[in-house]
Amino acid sequence: MMIKWIISILTMSIMPVLVYSSSIFRFRSEDVELCYGNLYFDRIYNNVVNIKYIPEHIPYKYNFINRTFSVDELDNNVFFTHGYFLKHKYGSLNPSLIVSLSGNLKYNDIQCSVNVSCLIKNLATSISTILTSKHKTYSLHRSKCITIIGYDSIIWYKDINDKYNDIYDFTAICMLIASTLIVTIYVFKKIKMNS
């Protein structure tokens, strides 16, 4: 009988932590999908290049607010930055996600080499993600290079300057304490009634 109560106390104690962990993982995995896609590079003339980035997947819960794209070229190096602001479909008008994809593309007559980094700032969870990729080489065919963007490393970190910092941690801890107290009081009352 006592083992049954101990198992229920442990279950009630662990549940809020599991809910918190799964929600953070869900936010991270959906956001990271915005960094994967195809980068099309086309050298039109000697001094003119055309770069186009198409994300592989856009999570259904986001709408685009604004998009920026800049390209600079020096010799055979092309530097590009692609930034976009997204908001939740059913949220406020303010952006809830900022994604910045930047990179360096170096090309010659037969190949192109790409270094890419992607920064995602989720304003809802105050979590930022950095993805980096180095020296991916692709063949140049008729002055065109199609790059499939993948990453070597992923770093997640929680922003410390946000006014809502640790609100999810605080909520999970409060739920853990409350559920443990409720179950403990219930167990003690049951034990008193049975004795």
Swiss-Prot record:
InterPro entries: Orthopox_A43R. The keyword Iron-sulfur does not apply. Pfam families: Orthopox_A43R (PF06517). Residues 1-21 form the signal peptide. Glycans are attached at residues 66, 115. It is found in: Host membrane; Host cell surface. Residues 23-166 are extracellular. GO terms for cellular component: host cell membrane; host cell surface; membrane. The chain crosses the membrane at residues 167-187. Residues 188-195 are cytoplasmic. It comes from the Viruses. Keywords: Glycoprotein, Host membrane, Late protein, Membrane, Signal, Transmembrane, Transmembrane helix. It is a single-pass type I membrane protein. Belongs to the orthopoxvirus OPG172 protein family. This is Protein A43. It comes from Variola virus (isolate Human/India/Ind3/1967) (VARV). The gene is OPG172.
